[in-house]
């Protein structure tokens, strides 16, 4: 039982969209670092270290401090994100079931790879191998390549990621491949290059095409392996140069990130923003 605004909201079995096995999972993994998700005014569920490090800083630079708005950032892995989201959904089969009055933004990656990233002869930008399935049709990674998915399949993938949306739960899917790829593509390429190399001189050697440049930078991020978190921390410091310039900074961000932050805080002033 939780209290919000002087009202009680039961979250036991039968009162939320959670299944019995979801409760077992949450009892095991809902540690003290995630418990505040029930007492916040808003929640952002994220799946990666980069989001954990950068989303609070991005929100701050947009003039929408998560702390000021009582928003909790909760890190979950991809498979468990839906379980956490279901906590906030009411059970439509129970007459007296009421959803928790907490806005929840779920940030997730599209996870479809562009052809420009394929490692093959003649492609200087490629770094990911395209793998065919075995003789039994199993394995491989063809399903992850953007060009090998029809638009209906892509739409189905997006719908699956957002299958528990409704009431106050809303999923925001990356405009392109991943969170970091989008940051590189839509305006922060130079800053990411600096975070990766500790200099900005070499950025002129990157492709002049924003998409190819993002592929190059994401290849460099992937090559960091376990050191990717250090890149995120460096980037958080570098983008602090946009402090006091929310309108300028906003133009350098992919739209899905801006919309997610607005959803759990409040709308930003009306300014022209390019749709990606």
Where are the regions that the model predicts?
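Acidic, divalent-metal-binding catalytic cores of TOPRIM
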Residues: 1-276
